[in-house]
Swiss-Prot record:
<dbReference type="InterPro" id="IPR013785">
    <property type="entry name" value="Aldolase_TIM"/>
</dbReference>
<dbReference type="GO" id="GO:0004834">
    <property type="term" value="F:tryptophan synthase activity"/>
</dbReference>
<keyword id="KW-0822">Tryptophan biosynthesis</keyword>
<comment type="similarity">
    <text>Belongs to the TrpA family.</text>
</comment>
<keyword id="KW-0456">Lyase</keyword>
<dbReference type="GO" id="GO:0005829">
    <property type="term" value="C:cytosol"/>
</dbReference>
<dbReference type="Pfam" id="PF00290">
    <property type="entry name" value="Trp_syntA"/>
</dbReference>
<comment type="function">
    <text>The alpha subunit is responsible for the aldol cleavage of indoleglycerol phosphate to indole and glyceraldehyde 3-phosphate.</text>
</comment>
<keyword id="KW-0057">Aromatic amino acid biosynthesis</keyword>
<comment type="subunit">
    <text>Tetramer of two alpha and two beta chains.</text>
</comment>
<feature type="active site" description="Proton acceptor">
    <location>
        <position position="49"/>
    </location>
</feature>
<comment type="pathway">
    <text>Amino-acid biosynthesis; L-tryptophan biosynthesis; L-tryptophan from chorismate: step 5/5.</text>
</comment>
<dbReference type="InterPro" id="IPR002028">
    <property type="entry name" value="Trp_synthase_suA"/>
</dbReference>
<protein>
    <recommendedName>
        <fullName>Tryptophan synthase alpha chain</fullName>
        <ecNumber>4.2.1.20</ecNumber>
    </recommendedName>
</protein>
<keyword id="KW-0028">Amino-acid biosynthesis</keyword>
<dbReference type="InterPro" id="IPR018204">
    <property type="entry name" value="Trp_synthase_alpha_AS"/>
</dbReference>
<feature type="active site" description="Proton acceptor">
    <location>
        <position position="60"/>
    </location>
</feature>
Length: 267
């Protein structure tokens, strides 16, 4: 069974929700990323999203854009990310999802990417700028290797798009809680509950929600409505502000506070 599927099944049995943490692979370098993955799991993360750095991250706000720039400056490539995941898998089995843009995957080759990612131990992939209606070739290769492809939905997604994502997506659906780019927000949308209920009526896979979640209270509020909550920019910001042991301590403290705030998630 795919690690993502197993993770959501286990969380449901425990009556809690998934904490999904996003960091950029290679920020500040891949050695740090490799060390951070088990640290995130130990602090309470259930699923790790690894951002694949890209030179034109159109959906990302300044925090993740700067993170991508730092990773690219450290010579981070898709091939090196997969080698790092392969090394992580020697001792850590936390579900790992690669998230990013289509261009690097297209350049790598769909079949080669699906094969190499699956062999490295990647469980899922989310391509921000790949509409599900245009994903057939990529999906064929990914599904053949049990590489679960997730898609984004937003508050402006049509019923037709929701139905298509429900038919084609696997692993989970990533619901974007706000329109615009990534980045911390002050509060959770008051309409989120109704929006998620509309999606849930048409979707059978778990729904995780993210974009803008930066505090334990926000994480708790979103987790009460979704199957999981994604925290990205607020975590990535720590990589800009800290390094070394201080970074490890700050990441551990922040992730543990998120996990403890989620209903049923206290250690």
């Amino acid at each position: 069974m795919n690690r993502l599927t197993h993770c959501f099944n286990e969380l449901k049995q425990r009556n809690t929700k998934a904490l999904v943490t996003f960091i950029t692979a290679g920020d500040p370098d891949l050695a740090t990323t490799q060390a951070m993955i088990p640290l995130l799991q130990q602090a309470g993360a259930d699923i790790i999203e690894l951002g694949m750095p890209f030179s034109d991250p159109m959906a990302d706000g300044p925090t993740i854009q700067l993170s991508s720039e730092r990773a690219l400056a450290a010579s981070t490539t898709l091939e090196r990310i997969l080698a790092m995941v392969r090394a992580v898998r020697r001792s850590c089995q936390v579900p790992i999802v690669l998230m990013g843009y289509l261009n690097p995957i297209h350049a790598y080759g769909y079949e080669r990417f699906a094969n190499d990612a699956a062999e490295a131990g990647v469980d899922g992939v989310l391509v921000v700028d790949m509409p599900p209606e245009e994903a057939e070739s990529f999906l064929n290769h990914a599904n053949a290797r049990d590489l679960q492809v997730a898609f984004l939905l937003t508050p402006t997604s049509t019923d037709s798009r929701i139905a298509t994502v429900g038919r084609l997506g696997r692993g989970f659906v990533y619901y974007v809680t706000v329109t615009g780019v990534t980045g911390a927000r002050q509060q959770v949308s008051t309409t989120l509950g109704g929006e998620l209920a509309k999606v849930r009526a048409k979707i059978s896979v778990p729904i995780v929600a993210g974009f803008g979640i930066s505090t334990p209270q926000q994480a708790a509020d979103v987790a009460a409505m979704a199957d999981g909550v994604v925290v990205g920019s607020a975590l990535v910001k720590l990589f800009q502000l800290h390094s070394g042991e201080e970074l490890r301590q700050e990441v551990t403290r922040f992730v543990a506070s998120l996990r403890q705030a989620i209903p049923g998630g206290a250690a």
